[in-house]
């Protein structure tokens, strides 16, 4: 039993690249460099986003007119797909040739 434990000591059970007891992957130089580059980009984004271009008072309602125009354009595009209204008076207007009975 002790001999079996000694001989099978370093074995990864099951599939060696997936699972709970998997073999750890070595970190390459390229992976380190790409991670550093990604963290630098994230830090720069955080820096620029931490300083807003407009104050909260300026930002409040600055795009209301543009948003209203965009909504009107969307509404007009949606209503243009529908056919025009049809009225019964227009449909039966050809029957009003003569009104001798009235």
Swiss-Prot record:
Q: What is its main location?
A: mitochondrion
Q: What is this protein called?
A: Large ribosomal subunit protein mL63
> Which species does the entry assign this protein to?
Mus musculus
Which keywords has UniProt assigned to this entry? Mitochondrion, Ribonucleoprotein, Ribosomal protein
**From the Swiss-Prot or TrEMBL record, what is one GO molecular function term?**
structural constituent of ribosome
Into which family does the record put it?
Answer: Belongs to the mitochondrion-specific ribosomal protein mL63 family.
Example of a GO biological process term: mitochondrial translation
Which Pfam families would you find in this protein's record? MRP-63
Subcellular location, in the record's words? Answer: Mitochondrion
Taxonomic lineage is: Eukaryota, Metazoa, Chordata, Craniata, Vertebrata
Q: Beyond the main fields, what else does the record say? A: Identified only in the intact 55S subunit. It is unknown whether it belongs to the 28S or to the 39S subunit. May localize at the subunit interface and dissociate from the 55S mitoribosome during subunit separation.
Q: Name one GO cellular component term.
A: mitochondrial inner membrane
Q: Which domain of life is it from?
A: Eukaryota
